[in-house]
């Protein structure tokens, strides 16, 4: 009975996620339904009273601070950024635990396991939300707790999250919270979110009179604001078709809003409030200003037509991932200033050999969507 009730509660939390394309503004939510305020790019520099004289932040201090710091590495199972939202099964489970404790979650992304353990023991983080091999790291002043796996059956390799060996109360709470069903439920949930995003992208292939009428409704706005981007208005229109299908009320599960699917934090950087983000004219204006900023950011790409593809990719996935793909292209004999070379590494950033490469700074990426995004817009335009 208790197991069934636990599963019911977990599924209730999963069902609370914001679904794609609702028609009115709602509070931004995490994938678990937790309402959060959008933060600016400097949020990772937020200062809290984190740590004690022995370098350990107790459970009581975490609750008092209202923040838990998770140490992780980039990867499809651990943590990655997807349209401004944290994803990865280990991260999503940790987010669920933080919600249960009533605190926010801050991510500290590390390069490798050595860095994670070092930061944990120095008090720079509270939990390592990565499956660490107990046999290999059992002598590193760690207390294994929380989410665990056992590979290859009962005689296989045991792995688990970890906290500092002195943090007994936090370890106890993690052990009481975790249920063996959580990883599978979380993976299924993440798969549904990703499938929803892919379906959304694939379905934006409208045609016919109704679609033409929707497009024509905004043509004057595209013409008015495209000069802010230094781009043809027809390109901005094609981008809008890909982003929302000309649906001014569209909102994605990740919180992207309006015709040009602006994230509230991005809109705020350009002075656009939450209350105005669905306004078609202001949404288009900010998107054009953002595209203009990205075109300038990639001014090292000498050919203007090539630069457009880089700016579009950055609009979709963020400049960091695009720069990583450029670095990989340069390292492996491609031309980092030609999109035909770089798009290959946009795709390869989903492979460990490449997202763990020393030249990569922003880790794992689901690049197929960005690859298709640029191609679809260029094809329409």
Model-derived features: positions:
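Extracytoplasmic small-molecule ligand-binding "clamshell" domains
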Residues: 27-131, 174
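Catalytic and substrate-binding regions of cell-wall glycan-acting enzymes that process beta-1,4-linked
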Residues: 163, 306-380
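Bacterial signal peptide processing site
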Residues: 22-25
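Export/targeting segments at the very N-terminus of extracytoplasmic proteins
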Residues: 197-246, 281-284, 299-302
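Substrate-binding/active-site groove segments that recognize
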Residues: 249-275, 282-293, 377
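A bilobed periplasmic-binding-protein/Venus flytrap-type ligand-binding module shared by bacterial periplasmic
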Residues: 155-171
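A ligand-binding cleft/hinge motif common to bilobed small-molecule-binding domains
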Residues: 114, 118-121, 128-143, 323-324, ...
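Ligand-binding clefts/hinges and TM-proximal coupling segments of bilobed small-molecule sensing domains
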Residues: 44-46, 176-213, 381
């Amino acid at each position: 009975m208790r197991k069934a009730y636990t599963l019911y509660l977990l599924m209730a939390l999963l069902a609370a996620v914001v679904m794609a394309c609702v028609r009115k503004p709602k509070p931004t939510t995490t994938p678990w339904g937790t309402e959060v305020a959008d933060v600016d790019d400097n949020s990772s520099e937020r200062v809290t009273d984190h740590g004690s004289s022995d370098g350990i932040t107790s459970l009581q201090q975490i609750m008092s601070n209202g923040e838990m710091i998770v140490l992780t590495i980039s990867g499809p199972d651990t943590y990655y950024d997807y349209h401004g939202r944290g994803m990865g099964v280990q991260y999503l489970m940790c987010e669920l635990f933080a919600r249960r404790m009533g605190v926010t979650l801050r991510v500290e992304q590390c390069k490798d396991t050595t860095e994670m353990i070092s930061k944990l023991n120095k008090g720079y983080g509270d939990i390592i939300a990565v499956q660490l091999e107990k046999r290999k790291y059992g002598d590193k002043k760690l207390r294994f707790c929380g989410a665990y796996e056992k590979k290859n059956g009962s005689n296989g390799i045991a792995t688990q999250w970890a906290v500092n060996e002195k943090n007994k109360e936090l370890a106890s709470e993690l052990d009481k919270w975790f249920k063996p069903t959580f990883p599978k439920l979380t993976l299924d949930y993440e798969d549904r979110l990703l499938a929803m995003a892919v379906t959304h992208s694939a379905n934006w292939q409208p045609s016919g009179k109704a679609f033409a009428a929707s497009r024509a409704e905004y043509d004057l706005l595209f013409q008015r604001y495209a000069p802010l981007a230094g781009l043809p208005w027809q390109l901005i229109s094609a981008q809008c078709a890909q982003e929302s299908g000309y649906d001014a009320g569209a909102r994605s599960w990740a919180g992207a809003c309006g015709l040009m699917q602006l994230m509230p934090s991005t809109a705020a950087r350009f002075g656009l409030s939450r209350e105005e983000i669905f306004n078609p004219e202001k949404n288009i204006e900010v998107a054009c200003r953002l595209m203009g900023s990205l075109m300038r950011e990639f001014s090292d790409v000498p050919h203007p037509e090539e630069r457009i593809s880089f700016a579009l990719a950055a609009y979709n996935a963020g400049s960091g991932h695009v720069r990583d793909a450029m670095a990989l292209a340069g390292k492996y004999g491609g031309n980092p200033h030609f999109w035909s070379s770089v798009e290959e590494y946009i795709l390869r950033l989903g492979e460990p050999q490449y997202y763990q490469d020393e030249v990569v700074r922003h880790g794992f990426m689901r690049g197929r969507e960005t690859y298709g995004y640029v191609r679809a817009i260029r094809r329409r335009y």
